[in-house]
Amino acid sequence: MKKCICCELGYVDDGGDGICTVCGWQDDDIQNDDPDFAGGANELSLNEYRRKFKEKRKINSNYVWAESKT
């Protein structure tokens, strides 16, 4: 397991394509290396996803992606 590059709160499996249960970011080496690249495993770029996650946490400081999917 490694710390999520997007939210730095959750963890993803080593070896690629794990999904963080805190923010929902799917680990993608290309997007991790180029944070402005949209596409690949995630529709949004890493920078866009970080911004949206931070906005959600401002509205609800306890927001967790995994809970929003149920």
What are these regions (language model features)?
Residues 23-25, 39:
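Short, low-complexity, polar/charged sequence segments that are solvent-exposed and flexible
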Residues 4-7, 20-23:
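Short cysteine-rich clusters marking metal-coordination/redox-active sites
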Residues 25-31:
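Short Cys/His-rich micro-motifs in 6-15 aa windows
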Residues 32-70:
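Short, intrinsically disordered terminal segments enriched in charged and Pro/Gly residues
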Residues 2-5, 31-35:
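Generic, low-specificity signal for short hydrophobic/alpha-helical stretches with a mild N-terminal bias
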Residues 10-12, 27:
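Cys/His-rich microdomains that often coordinate metals
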